[in-house]
Amino acid sequence: MTSPNNSNKNNISANNETDKESSEKQNGMLAGIFERATKSGLGRKKSNPSPVESAVAKDMADIHSNPTKLRLAFLGGGSFGTAMANLAARNGCDTTLWVRNKRTVKAMAKTQTNKKYLPGYKLDDRLKYSHDLAASVKDKDIIFIAVPGLAFRETLKNIAPFISGQSIVSLTKGMEKDTFAMMSDIIKEVLPEVNFGVMSGPNLAIEIMKNMPSATVIASESEPLRHAVQAALHSAFFRVFASDDIRGVELGGALKNIYAIAMGMAAAYEVGENTKAMILTRALAEMSRFGVEEGANPLTFLGLSGVGDLYATCSSELSRNYRIGNMLGRGMSIDAAVKKLGQTAEGVNTIQQVHEKATKAGIYMPITHALYAVIYEDKAALGVALHLMEAGFRSDVEFVMAHDHSNAALTAHMKTSGSNTKSKDSDADK
């Protein structure tokens, strides 16, 4: 006869195994281990923990026994801004997430979830929410800005009256429409005296919320600011590396969106691994050429904010830019694709900006120009791709130096590309 105590133990064991299987099925085995270790580190003891679980539990216990006393504001309630604010709150920082809509703020505070961008993921109960911009940024140590690129300048102007020593960190990837300004350029223009940095890397918000191990790069000329951001966000799940190459890190985060669109289009045509590898490596070459022209260190593109972010964005169907590209590849118009996505896809604007800049500077960027032809000149994607493959002979590893090859011939070649491979009545457009 089984005793009540043994029965309870068996039930607990069964429940634990069910939790384990559910977590690993949803998030992956490694993330499941990390999640269980976190619970252990927060007071739920487990007998015979694995070495990984023990290490993570110790890390989380240290964080909660010695919380970082930084005062932080995160502006922008999208997926990435919310995920970063949640990390900071979990690390013990005094963290406020500012969202423009008052009704959304009330809903987030009540449910502790971001139902629009991160449905189903509970946020740390220490995270505070506000729609009052002045109150959100006053007396803070660091202000993280995670609004879309189109709203970045306006947001800086709105917080300018309340800046009195706070540092600014941009989480926004992309370029300002019509000016080609990076977010760091806008910060220097609007708030010339402020201490600032930019953060970028292979950071899909949903994976971060699932506690899947991830990493990012904080770039700033200020070593104290780099260290402060590392202290605020670094954990067993999320590593923060430092760099002083602001331009390179920022360009990596902006340019990779172009090639995520290209990869999404390629996926729609069900290409093989050879094609994907070709796109990825030639994209890296284009990024580095362009970066050198803009004053970046080409080696930065071999790090997390370059090839790391490029790989993650080009490999994931979670990427907004990948999804835009996939819809384009299936015959949908750019306007219809953007409408269906319902979120900002920075790569669409970036393609236009980089195409114009590269054409003027004579930087060899055939993939970028091909995408411009498809999106802005209504060229047939398949026809442009075929002409791209027929382009002249090139060297392979040439991306560590700026390229002086003119794009005039390539541009002229694409303008003459036929449109007979494009369907006039695509079902996806209806």
Q: Each PLM stretch: what is its role?
A:
Residues 119-128, 192-194, 236-238, 363:
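A short helix-to-beta-strand connector/capping loop
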Residues 170, 195-200, 240-244, 303, ...:
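General beta-strand structural signal in soluble alpha/beta enzymes
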Residues 123, 129-138, 142-213, 229-231:
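Rossmann-like NAD(P)(H) cofactor-binding subdomain of soluble oxidoreductases
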